[in-house]
Amino acid sequence: MQHAAHSDFEEVKNIFYQYKDIFPHIRTDYLMRQIEGGHCIYKDGIVITYNFYKRPQPIGTVIAGKFHCILHQIVKDSTKDTSASSVLKEFFEYARADVWLSVRRDNVVAKKFYEKNGMKLVGECSWAAETLPGDVYLYQRTRSLSNEL
């Protein structure tokens, strides 16, 4: 997988700025830490930020396992005609673990994209003192008896 380098920072930042309505909370220092930490994929105008859990971690009504992957953000440069699906599928192979993410419940376009790429709706979550509802999706590579809280 192709990770972002320091020299990619401005391009990565500008891609996120295209989606300020969806990612108003993304700060430039966060993006720099993701790049410096090796947790930012940048390929063909697609950016994925992620991490791996060191211990079981609750995500809303479900629990991600130790060493599972959390996909924080995936964004596509709106000026490029590239396939986010192909980069996401390549990321699933790279991660070699269950991949989790949370998404705003009203983000129908993103949810259809995740489902089209093999992710399943497995739980619920919320932000902003439970005023902003969300859903939890999982791309499951491992067998598990239960991931519910």
Task: Indicate residue ranges for each PLM-predicted region.
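Short hydrophobic clusters on alpha-helical segments that form packing/core surfaces
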Residues: 91-95, 110
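Conserved short alpha-helix immediately C-terminal to the canonical SAM/SAH-binding motif I
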Residues: 87, 107-110
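Conserved N-terminal entry element of GNAT/NAT acetyltransferase domains
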Residues: 1-7, 145-149
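Acetyl-CoA-dependent GNAT
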Residues: 6, 15-81, 85-90
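Hydrophobic pocket/interface hotspot
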Residues: 12
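C-terminal "cap" of GNAT-fold acetyltransferases
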Residues: 68, 104-108, 116, 124-149
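Conserved GNAT acetyl-CoA-binding A-motif
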Residues: 94-105
